[in-house]
Curated annotation (Swiss-Prot):
Its EC number is 3.6.1.73. This is Inosine/xanthosine triphosphatase. Belongs to the YjjX NTPase family. Binds 1 divalent metal cation per subunit; can use either Mg(2+) or Mn(2+). Keywords: Hydrolase, Magnesium, Manganese, Metal-binding, Nucleotide metabolism, Nucleotide-binding. It comes from Serratia proteamaculans (strain 568).
Amino acid sequence: MYHVVAATTNPAKIKAIQLAFEDTFGQDQCRIESVDVASGVSLQPIGNHETRTGARQRVMEARQVRPEADFWVGVEAGIEENMTFAWMTVENPQTRGESRSASLMLPETILQGIRAGRELGSEMATITGNAEVKRQGGAIGIFTDGRLSRTSVYHQALLLALVPFHNPIYQNHNNAAQK
C-alpha cells in the first residue's frame, strides 16, 4: 500500500488526490495523509510561475515532514490575468510529475477584489454567503452550477500528473530521452 502525503488540509483537494490515486493504482492501494505545510508563496498566488512554485514548495515541505512516504502531492491554485487555475506536483523519491488544471475565466468584480489583495476564496465567500466555498466546490462549482467542482477539475489534472509513475510507454520514452 502506497503512503501518499497530501500537502494540504483542504477537503476538496484531498478528495481529488484520493480519487486520482485510486483511479491510477486501484481501490485500497493508497493511504492518504494530510499535512499542513506552507506554500512559500502569497496567499493568493498571481501568475503561472508563482502558482507552480507554490505546488512544488508544498511538496518539498511535505517531504521534510514525512520523508518515509512513497508519494508527496502539492496542489496550488492561482490567478493569471482573468483566469483561475491550479498546478499539481506529484513526486516520489525518483520522479516528478506535474500538470496544470483547466482554467476558469472570472468576472470583473471578483478580479477587482483580487487586484485589491483579497483571495479568490474570500471573494467567493462574500458573493455566495458560504464561508466554506473554497473547501467545497469552489468558484468552479459555483460558476458551472455544480457541473464541475474543484475536486473534479483537480482530479483530472492529477491523473495527468501521475502519468510518469505508471505508464510504461511514457516511462520508456522519457528514459530514452534522458540517456
